[in-house]
Amino acid sequence: LLALKDIEHLTNLEAEAISPSLAAQFPNSGPENVLGIELNTYAAELARVSVWIGEIQWMRRNGFEAAKNPILKPLGNIEKRDAVLVTDEQGNPVLDAEGKPQRAKWPKADVVVGNPPFLGDKKMISELGEDYTIALRRAWSDVPGGADLVCYWFAGAWRRMAIGELERAGMVSTNSIRAGANREVLKSIVDGGQIFEAWGDE
């Protein structure tokens, strides 16, 4: 959000420098431009509050008056749900009419920035349950069975870019993303696109 607001603010200032008639306007971008999916209830609410705090800090730092009444507003565009598999409220996979598990849909966006959960493939059944893990692998049959959980986010982002639904994506992962079955997910991205600004051991 802060980067988006910085870009908009800089554009307004440059427009004003070109012509006084293009005087800098009040920022239009705000928390409503930030969409998100978070499974944990506490983390979802924390994300909503963090976005609002960032908004208030940016407005004050750049000489604008922040909202006062109320200071924080509901932010329903950060959803509390599974990001890779359609599940019910108990976290059980929901099957379609043909009895198949379904990939979760992501909100329409231009850019995705994600910090997916890190869980090795050998721990998925013990941590997520056998039914969930089997359903996840069935729904994402293009992801190798031995891939870590984080790979489903990489595959999801790339699939959307490949069909023009997404412009860019930035993901956080561990170094294990470069090895084993995980590497196959990266290979499909490199074969059809490009990975840049990849920072190792950060």
Model-identified regions with their sequence ranges:
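A compositional/structural signature marking long, glycine- and acidic/polar-rich segments
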Residues: 12-28, 182, 188-189, 195-197
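A phosphate-binding catalytic loop at a beta-strand-loop-alpha-helix junction
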Residues: 1-7
